[in-house]
Each structure stands twice: as C-alpha cells, then as structure tokens.
Design a protein with these regions (language model features):
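RNase H-like polynucleotidyl transferase catalytic core
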Residues: 25-31, 100-119, 135-136
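Single, function-defining residue in the core of a domain
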Residues: 63-68, 72, 80-81, 85, ...
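C-terminal anion-handling pockets and recognition modules
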Residues: 1, 119-174
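Short, aromatic/basic amphipathic alpha-helical patches
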Residues: 91-101
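Extended, low-complexity cationic-aromatic segments
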Residues: 1-68, 168-174
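Short glycine/proline- and charge-enriched loop/turn segments
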Residues: 19-24, 102-106, 124-130
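Acidic/histidine-rich, metal-coordinating catalytic segments
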Residues: 5-6, 76-89, 110-113, 118
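Short aromatic-enriched loop/helix-cap "lid" or pocket-rim segments at secondary-structure transitions
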Residues: 13-16, 93-94, 119-122
Length: 174
C-alpha cells in the first residue's frame, strides 16, 4: 500500500517561532512572490519515501511520470491511496492504466475533504513545520535545494515516517 499526495512549497517561510528584542518587530528579508514548487510524494507502509519536485502545478502528465517513477522503485502489486485531485482522475492517468499499468497498480480514492486520512499529509507537515521552519529563500533554485535537503534528512528518520502512518484517524490492517 502506498499513500500519495501533492503539496506546494512557497518562497515565503512558514514561521514557527521567531525572536526579537522587546519592542522591536522581527523583520524577514524575503521577496513577496507567488513562485512555488509543486511536490508529489509517496509513502509506503515500510517507511519508504518517494518524492518528485517540479516548478509548476501538478497536471495529469506529471502524475503519470510520477506513477512510472513509483512503479520502477516499488516492486510487486501496489494499492495506491490518494485524494480526488482532478489530475488523478484525468485522461492521462486513465490512458496510462489502460496501457498496462493497471496490472500492477490499483487506485483507491480517499473520501472528499478528508486529508487527515492520508499519512502523506503528516510528511508535508513535518517537512514544512519542522525541517523547513523559518527558512527564508530568495529564489526557486534555493528553495528546491532546501526542500531536497529536508527530504534527505527525513528519509533517515524512519520513526517519523512510520509515525505518519500510525497517526490517529488512519487505521491500517495488514
């Protein structure tokens, strides 16, 4: 079983904690920009984390590329659990399944408006509010590097990844 979800990472930092001397407002020197990275992530039951980073919003062909990446790295048949993003239901994914991927891949959509049922959401929370807290980036290339570094650190924290799977609200029976 593999849990898949998408997230956006912006140049604006996710402030968790800040400090300034009494009477002085803390100021962060970051550009106001809507530039962002879109990230597709997959978390397996044994704590393997697969990530795909791109500079644009996730569309159907991007999902297909990620599914090919996933199939190349996870052996055997896969039950894939994800949300109801329109890119997941698009023609590109349907064509990919019809081309033979359905032999190894079974798709299961989560109920609408139930992101807490997807353990991958816990991965995003950990990345944004623990690994990347208070990180200020001025360019997408810098943000991409910081996100990659945070992901690599997280890959070694298998207890955190497994904790995302064991979270309340997500019961998995083997």
């Amino acid at each position: 079983m593999v849990f898949v979800d998408e997230a956006g990472f912006r140049l604006l930092p996710g402030l968790v904690l800040t400090y300034a001397p009494r009477g002085q407002t803390p100021i962060l020197d970051v550009p106001f920009s809507r530039d962002h990275l879109s990230v597709i992530g997959a978390l397996t039951l044994d704590g393997m984390l697969l990530i795909w980073i791109q500079n644009h919003s996730v569309k159907g062909p991007d999902v297909v590329r990620f599914l090919k990446h996933l199939l190349a790295r996870v052996p055997g048949k896969i039950m894939l659990v994800w949300d109801n993003l329109s890119a997941h239901r698009g023609q590109a994914v349907k064509d990919f399944l019809a081309s033979g991927a359905a032999k190894r891949l079974t798709l299961q959509a989560l109920p609408s408006y139930a992101p807490d049922l997807n353990p991958q959401e816990g991965v995003w929370r950990f990345l944004k509010y623990v690994e990347l807290k208070n990180i200020c980036c001025h360019h997408l290339a810098e943000l991409r590097l910081e996100v990659r570094r945070a992901i690599e650190r997280l890959r070694f924290k298998v207890d955190v990844l497994l904790g995302c799977i064991r979270q309340p609200g997500c019961v998995i029976q083997s």
